[in-house]
Amino acid sequence: MLTSRQNEWVIEGFEIGHHTADGDGWLTGTTVVLAQGGAIGGVDVRGGGPGTRETDLLHPTTVIDRIDAVVLTGGSAYGLAAANGVMAGLEAAGIGWPVGLEPHQVVPIVPAAVIFDLGRGGVFGNRPTDEFGKLALAAATVQRPETGSVGAGTGAVCGGIKGGFGYAETELESGVSVAAAVVVNAAGSVVDSESGRLWADRRRLLATPSDPEREALATAHAQAQRSAATTIGVVMTDAILTKAQANKVAAVAHDGMARAIRPVHSMFDGDTVFCLASSRRSVAEDQIRSLFAFNSLLAAAADVFADACLDGVLAASGRGSWKSYTELAPSVVG
């Protein structure tokens, strides 16, 4: 059984930080998910145009078994530079894979993925640099992260309306926690064109938009400029997982993306999901029970990913010609 929750803190073992550049030709940013003491990592890339870094290291056959942080960032391939800033900050703290005899001789392991938001602030050359990574890392905290048009979600757009950064978490009956941090920036739509409802509203928490609101949403979708996009995210858990299991979690989390966005995984998207497991809590005591418990964790990963997509869209605020969902359909939230 899944229990959704709204805590003041990120689940144990992780910190999240944003750096946002909004205004004066800027509309982009960077988000860092920091794993305290490192975490087992996995990844699944399904979009047709991904922009990633260090994803090969997460394959179960490679030697690296602990990930220090994951960077989610705007700026398309240019934005991968933000990971350099995170590496520099971690190196200064002596955090990373040891490669020498001295404590400071480390290589921080920092996978990254990007969204396409180039030029959305008005200046094509304004995109994240290594400084963005440094500032996002410095801002990392165990407090529940701000969501909406912040960090990597600052310049996010989906199907003609404003996207954003979202966060959701849940706790399984076993006590294992699962959370997702997602940047919703899709070529597809997050809105059911017939009803005007958000695909991700699986619990029917929101009211149905009025006829004028549905028309406004349909117009925004029809006028949307089709361009490169990408939805990216990190599933976090305090469960003890192997690298193979972490990769499976990342793969199944894409089911949540598919529930929230239609179509998804297009040739215009670079959809990428990471999984980080802090290995603080066992999912079950024996192998048979562990398989059933792991299945529950997989289902939870998909659910929280969809919920984080919903959160990112609802928390977003309009920028320029991109109105937010709640601006176009204010009655849905009362």
Regions found by a protein language model. Give the residues of each.
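A structural signal for small-residue-enriched, beta-sheet-centric alpha/beta enzyme cores
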Residues: M1-A77, A81-N84, A92-G334
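Active-site-surrounding "flap" and adjacent substrate/cofactor-binding loops of secreted or lumenal enzymes
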Residues: M87
